[in-house]
Regions:
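Well-ordered, non-membrane alpha-helical segments in soluble/globular domains
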Residues: 18, 91-99, 161-167
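Short beta-strand-to-loop acidic/aromatic patch adjacent to the donor-nucleotide binding site
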Residues: 75-85
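Short, flexible, basic/aromatic active-site loop/helix in glycosyltransferases
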Residues: 122-136
Length: 215
């Protein structure tokens, strides 16, 4: 399949690597090239899922992600962070349909992770909802399939994750950005931590449900 998985992390998030890999292995149901981009700490393997790991001395988050993208030999990239713990089965059928539709409708980013939140959508002549020209999150790190060339264009080397979303979205306001969302999707993941590495509300319930260790 014409798809790679890009996972961003940092040394500080090392306690998340085991539960992330466990839930990824449990709910990601097809073979893909999975690229884990970190900083200086080697990322252990906790499950049967194979990850290609790259440690980068780039000082910025976006600089490291751009190095990871160089290893992606596919036209499309499923881009996520390591504090996203899946509890929804992503199948080969899901991905095949989404990628075919991205090619058919010339989509740059297709968000595939659940309810709209703060995003604003408009109708389109596709099976998906289109982000409005003034949507606050045209760029989002929520689980999405990206056209590789578009992702590279948006990742300025100096960006933090927050710059990527906020500044990146502001630069695309009122442009033909071609970003869409499958709004039929349920919530597909639990966001384990918030700013400051604080555990998210609901972590204990999710941990018990998924039989995960605390971190």
């Amino acid at each position: 399949m014409n798809l790679s998985v890009l996972i961003g992390t940092c040394d500080r998030y090392s306690p998340l690597w085991e539960p992330f890999q466990i839930t990824f292995d449990r709910y990601w149901k097809f073979d893909s090239k999975n690229i884990f981009v970190g900083e200086t700490i080697e990322i252990p393997k906790y499950t049967n899922t194979n990850f290609t790991t790259i440690l980068s001395d780039k000082k910025t988050w976006a600089g490291r992600m751009l190095e990871g993208i160089e290893l992606c030999d596919s036209e499309y990239i499923f881009f996520i962070l390591d504090d996203y713990f899946f509890d929804y089965v992503y199948t080969e059928e899901n991905m095949s349909t989404w990628i075919k539709d991205m090619e058919k409708y010339d989509i740059n980013r297709l968000q595939v992770c659940g309810p709209p939140g703060e995003q604003r959508y408009m109708d389109s002549n596709t099976p998906y909802a289109k982000f409005q020209p003034n949507s606050p999150y045209i760029i989002s790190i929520q689980p999405s399939i990206w056209r590789k060339s578009f992702l590279i264009e948006q990742l300025k080397s100096e960006y933090s994750p927050w710059d990527f979303e906020l500044v990146g979205s502001s630069l695309l306001l009122n442009t033909e950005h071609k970003t869409f969302a499958d709004v039929t999707m349920p919530r597909t993941y639990f966001n384990a931590v918030r700013i400051g590495f604080n555990k998210s509300v609901g972590w204990e319930e999710f941990r018990i449900k998924e039989k995960l260790k605390d971190f």
